[in-house]
């Protein structure tokens, strides 16, 4: 079950990937790339549901990303209501992300000039890309 990673990669366009010379949408390589960009200042450009992250929250997201086992992606990704990887994708690619979890809207907003908005949704067992605007 790699639906989380499939959803994120389906929402990214060639222009997004070209920003970092990412040549293809290989999930393992993409996660490895994200892990190399896991730096404190990256998270300071993102608002989650309108709020900037606190220093401790950033540290916790960084720790989760650092310890993420890429080999486990085929067992699914437990998407958090404030997910460190979605924060990272939002900041790195300068994209807003609207995540609808069941009936709850969760917003990741890049503080700066955005390049687009990813609309995704999930439930207790599935995550998918819906559209990009």
What is each PLM-predicted segment?
Residues 117-133:
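A recognition module on extended beta-rich or small alphabeta surfaces enriched in W/G with H and D/E
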């Amino acid at each position: 079950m790699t639906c989380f990673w499939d959803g994120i990669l389906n929402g990214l366009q060639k222009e997004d990937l070209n920003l970092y010379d990412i040549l293809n949408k290989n999930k393992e390589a993409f996660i490895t790339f994200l892990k190399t960009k896991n730096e404190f200042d990256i998270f300071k450009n993102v608002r989650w549901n309108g709020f900037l992250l606190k220093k401790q929250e950033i540290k916790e997201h960084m720790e989760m990303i650092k310890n993420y086992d890429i080999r486990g992606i085929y067992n699914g990704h437990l998407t958090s209501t404030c997910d460190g990887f979605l924060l990272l994708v939002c900041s790195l690619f300068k994209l807003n992300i609207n995540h609808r979890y069941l009936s709850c809207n969760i917003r990741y907003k890049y503080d700066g000039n955005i390049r687009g908005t990813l609309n995704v949704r999930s439930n207790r067992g599935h995550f998918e890309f819906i559209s990009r605007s």
